């Protein structure tokens, strides 16, 4: 008889939901045929920067980690472990995608292959550092098993460029906002990993800049009406996911001395502004209905989670959740229909 129980200290990954980090695969043939000539100089400069590996000595645990963490307990402990797990899975997802792209493109597009190899190096470093942090709480993720058991979602390479760009840039803003907040309020820095966020976020920023160059090298991804619609869709998808997730885990942000709603506003506003440098449009986050609609969705999502935790039969849960799901979809549609800001027109004005 085969023992299928997890080993002691090995954490069973959280159940996959719409909001959990996903694993992706893509069309490697299309990726190999991307014409990068329009951004060749920028990409070569970024490749040289990636080879320099400025953070190669950064992810080293120091003596601050060498202590008992039993004083972090109860809901705060659980919330922090969930944060570490989500972050680890997200970084590991990036590692797997970049590693596979590097392997598949090695003989077809060597510059792009090396770029993905170096980004995979960074993501693996991040995931390993986060998993070691989980070890301080007597848990860890079996990433080899996660690789085999996780569901993989296929995205065309064009979608990968949009979504990974946004993922890296929103990651940058999340890390730097937390770091700056804890610089001002060191009494809330309850674990040493947060001290690493300033240099850590620079990896995210560099990766985002690479994807910006890749995106701008493909005019069809920014110079037509379809690209504008897709840009709005992916911006809204990423921001809605962030808003719902942050409010789901408001306890973690409270433990850092952050208000979840205020943190979400800062991250979304800054990421949107940054995305305007790459995308043909950015969302109008200053519209009076923009954040209230997103926050309403977050409230509905909390109601759904409460229903899911109840002991009612699955059918009853589904009936109760359906109107809430419909309300989320409707409110997100209202956000999508808010007139966006034409960033290409702004670029022309600056010129």
Swiss-Prot record:
The protein's annotated pathway: Porphyrin-containing compound metabolism; chlorophyll biosynthesis (light-independent)
Q: Which UniProt keywords apply?
A: Chlorophyll biosynthesis, Iron, Metal-binding, NADP, Oxidoreductase, Photosynthesis
The source's domain of life comes to Bacteria
CDD domains per the record?
ACSF
Q: Which cofactor does it need?
A: Fe cation
What SUPFAM superfamilies does the entry give?
A: Ferritin-like (SSF47240)
One GO term (biological process): photosynthesis
**EC number, UniProt record:** 1.14.13.81
InterPro entries reported for this sequence? AcsF, Ferritin-like_SF, Rr_diiron-bd_dom
The catalytic activity, as recorded, is: Mg-protoporphyrin IX 13-monomethyl ester + 3 NADPH + 3 O2 + 2 H(+) = 3,8-divinyl protochlorophyllide a + 3 NADP(+) + 5 H2O
GO terms of molecular function: iron ion binding; magnesium-protoporphyrin IX monomethyl ester (oxidative) cyclase activity
- What is the stated purpose of this protein? Catalyzes the formation of the isocyclic ring in chlorophyll biosynthesis. Mediates the cyclase reaction, which results in the formation of divinylprotochlorophyllide (Pchlide) characteristic of all chlorophylls from magnesium-protoporphyrin IX 13-monomethyl ester (MgPMME).
Q: Say which family it is in.
A: Belongs to the AcsF family.
Give the matching PANTHER family. Answer: MAGNESIUM-PROTOPORPHYRIN IX MONOMETHYL ESTER [OXIDATIVE] CYCLASE, CHLOROPLASTIC
| Name under which the protein is recorded | Magnesium-protoporphyrin IX monomethyl ester [oxidative] cyclase 1
Taxonomic lineage: Bacteria, Bacillati, Cyanobacteriota, Cyanophyceae, Nostocales
Gene that this polypeptide is encoded by = acsF1
């Amino acid at each position: 008889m085969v023992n299928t129980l997890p080993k002691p200290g090995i954490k069973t990954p959280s159940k996959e939901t719409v909001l959990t980090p996903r694993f992706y695969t893509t069309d490697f043939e299309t990726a190999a045929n991307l014409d990068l000539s329009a951004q060749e100089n920028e990409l070569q400069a970024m490749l040289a920067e990636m080879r320099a590996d400025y953070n190669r000595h950064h992810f080293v645990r120091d003596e601050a980690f060498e202590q008992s963490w039993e004083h972090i307990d109860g809901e705060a402990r659980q919330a922090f472990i969930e944060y570490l797990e989500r972050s680890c899975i997200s970084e590991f997802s990036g590692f797997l995608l970049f590693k596979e792209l590097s392997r598949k493109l090695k003989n077809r597009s060597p510059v792009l292959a090396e770029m993905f190899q170096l980004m995979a190096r960074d993501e693996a470093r991040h995931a390993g550092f986060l998993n070691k942090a989980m070890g301080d709480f007597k848990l860890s993720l079996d990433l080899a098993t996660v690789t085999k058991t996780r569901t993989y979602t296929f995205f065309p390479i064009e979608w990968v460029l949009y979504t990974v760009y946004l993922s890296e840039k929103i990651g940058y803003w999340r890390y730097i906002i937390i770091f700056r907040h804890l610089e001002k309020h060191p009494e809330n820095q309850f674990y040493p990993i947060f001290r690493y966020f300033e240099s850590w976020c620079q990896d995210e920023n560099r990766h985002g800049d690479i994807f910006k160059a890749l995106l701008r090298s493909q005019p069809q991804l920014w110079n037509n009406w379809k690209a504008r619609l897709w840009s709005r869709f992916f911006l809204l998808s990423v921001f809605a996911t962030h808003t719902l997730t942050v409010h789901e885990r408001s306890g973690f942000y409270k433990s850092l001395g952050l208000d979840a709603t205020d943190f979400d506003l800062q991250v979304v506003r800054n990421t949107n502004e940054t995305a305007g440098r790459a995308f043909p449009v950015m969302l109008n986050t200053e519209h009076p209905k923009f954040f209230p609609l997103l926050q309403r969705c977050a409230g509905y999502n909390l109601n759904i989670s409460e229903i899911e935790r109840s002991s009612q039969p699955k059918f009853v849960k589904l009936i109760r959740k359906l109107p809430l799901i419909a309300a989320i979809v409707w409110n997100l549609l209202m956000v999508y229909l808010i007139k966006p800001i034409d960033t290409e027109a702004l670029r022309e004005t600056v010129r």
